[in-house]
């Protein structure tokens, strides 16, 4: 009985690993020029304060990921994630977070 559970969880883990490696993530996409401009502005605004720069870049990264499913999150979503805002492109529809969002909405 214990071996059956071990085999079951091994197969389950293997399925999870395969799905994670095959799915397209936001981090896998090339960064758009408009996002890179926002990063440069954040660097300029932060000056020599590294903690402020880290926080600013983290906010930009999180907003980019969150804008993929909600274009009305911030006014600059179309600049942070042009793949998905104002309209979802085929690349956007392949992203794991977008697919999960659409599945939760019942649109997929």
Swiss-Prot record:
Single GO MF descriptor = toxin activity
- The answer on whether this UniProt entry bears the keyword Membrane reads no
Keyword set includes Secreted: yes
PTM comment for this protein? Contains 3 disulfide bonds.
The organs and tissues expressing this protein are described as: Expressed by the venom gland.
Which is one Gene Ontology cellular component term of this protein? extracellular region
Give the superkingdom in one word. Answer: Eukaryota
Q: Which residues form the signal peptide?
A: 1-24
Q: Which UniProt keywords apply?
A: Disulfide bond, Secreted, Signal, Toxin
State its location(s).
Answer: Secreted
Family the UniProt entry places it in = Belongs to the scoloptoxin-10 family.
Q: Would you tell me the protein name for this molecule? A: U-scoloptoxin(10)-Sm1a
């Amino acid at each position: 009985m214990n071996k059956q559970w071990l085999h079951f969880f091994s197969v389950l883990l293997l399925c999870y690993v395969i799905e994670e490696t095959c799915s397209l993530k936001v981090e896998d996409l090339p960064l758009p020029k408009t996002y890179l401009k926002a990063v440069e502005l954040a660097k300029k605004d932060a000056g020599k304060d590294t903690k402020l720069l880290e926080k600013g870049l983290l906010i930009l990264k999180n907003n980019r990921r969150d804008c993929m499913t909600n274009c009305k999150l911030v006014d600059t979503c179309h600049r942070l994630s042009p793949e998905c805002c104002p309209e979802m492109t085929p690349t956007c529809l392949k992203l794991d977070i977008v697919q999960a969002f659409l599945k939760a909405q019942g649109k997929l």
